[in-house]
Amino acid sequence: FYKLKSYRYGYLPNQMRIFKITNKNRKNFLSYKDYLYLNGANGKYSKWLVDIVTTNKIFKNFKEDLTKIYYQMYIRDGKLKLIAFDKKLSDEEDAFFNFIKKQKSVLLMYTNYKMQYLIEYKNKNFYLNDEEITIESLKKFIFEEANTTRSLVLTENIVPSSKFKINGNEASLYLNVYNKNGLDPAIGEIYVKENSGYTTDQCDIAEEISDENIIESYKFKSYNKKKDSQESNDNSRIYFDEKTGKFRFFLVKRGDRVIKLKQTYKNEDLIKLIENNFEELNKKIIEIFKTVPQIEIAGVTICFTENGFKITNIHNNPEYCNATYFNKDYSNFLKYKYDTKRTLYKNVKYKINVFRKKLWLKLCRLFAKTCYPKGLVPYISFRWLRDIKNDFKENKNIPLKTKLWAYRHGFLSYRLPQYGITKENYKNFISDFEYKWLRHIDNYYKIWFEDKITIKYIASDYNKFFPKYYYFITLKQGENQIIPMMDCPKNLGNTYDDIIKLAKKEGDIALKRDKGSHGEGFYRLTYKNNKLYLNLKEATKDDIVNILSDKSNEYLVTEYIKQVDVLNNIYDGSVNTIRIIVFKKDGKTSTI
């Protein structure tokens, strides 16, 4: 009965015991089930934290604080491709293995963090996870692993400090970071967790426990047989105050009981290491997350080395706390996010839209599977018909017979005279349909190009070729929040008045939706002769505020690109762009 009751309340049974959950007080807590419901709280920006390559590019300004990536590996055309992340490194196979020899110890891991392997070179032999392996077998292993995932990376092997251990076992420091308004990131929880399970050494520690040192003790009944379940997590933990970094309590297990202790026992060196470095660590975490206001919640894993600390992972879904309560501010933030999501998903209009979207995608998949060659992205199936319809209506100078021939061979009819396509030479061309069928050539890493903010971070090394990004306006805590971005002048704040000041200073600035194309939702904000203009029409401050405060859209305030007179003479009503297609046949060499 107690087990069923726990599940009904949204907890695992032992969580109910630890937090003393009853029917009267359960609404005061954010349950484990509710916490899982918050997965994906970072929305479309969750993609920044699910792949080590993407994460390192987003946070490239802090590369010295992150795990260093040496190589990325993936399979293309049945062959293993090596991409060197450092220009000084060669991407030739022999050079790759010579580099491993030189480093002596490296990690081979999936880019999604799910698997990692230790590769060492010692005594003139290679070792994989401490087992000797020939270079031929190692090559085969890397090839087979690259075939099972989207890609692999070769990274540095971060060696922890001799002091960074719990009960003699290796440990990791975990931080839960949140940013409720996009401006003030903070640590919501901080603890060190033993990387392995309970040991004989720990049992000896448990024997030394005195009653006066016990803060609380919970009976821990095993309900789950799976070792990796949330409830059966057996690792010792040391919790710290998230504001000061001071030691709070030590969590150990003794028999069937989980015990909170005041005393640190044999872990004084680790405690001092964290406490002495907390101020620097907290400052660094705040500095990092201030640069990514789009990220609202993240888990950060840290390893302390002999030379400082390194961030080994930044991910979307921090672990639910099983031993102590979240602080009030962090708890309120999580509760607000939960309530907001529940309200949205209960909305009838939203439910109808979700149902319609799912039904549409299902129809697309069915239609694509039934009527098209295998491999077509489902939504293209209907778009291709739409393109044919538009082409049929618009190009009236092309005979009906010619149009039908073009459609049967995958071309839109206007392409025929444009490229001189005939019945004799059409096989020399890639048809419109074939090009659509190829989507998405970039596979997973197409996420880099899906919105304007992501590409700005990814390509920040070439910032001078991008418009300046001044502000990002997005919904936070129920209200639109104006968040200064990387190019915002230091003397400006984060109000609508500051955006007007920026327009007065620059003369022209651009207001555009973060996720949009074809100029939809674009405004040119101009200040001239003491008057404001939107798209060259006189406007008031209220007109501008009404656009930017629309909660249904995220807006970017950027530099307005003024084109040269030569292009302006062609058409001055918009920016006339030059489109360039770049491809990399070998995955490395860019070709126009």
State each model region's role:
Residues 45-53, 57-58, 72-95, 103-105, ...:
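Domain-scale recognition of functional cores that engage charged ligands
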Residues 63-64, 291-296, 463-464, 552:
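Short secondary-structure junctions
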Residues 252-297, 304-376:
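C-terminal active-site "lid" helix and adjoining low-complexity regulatory extension at the edge
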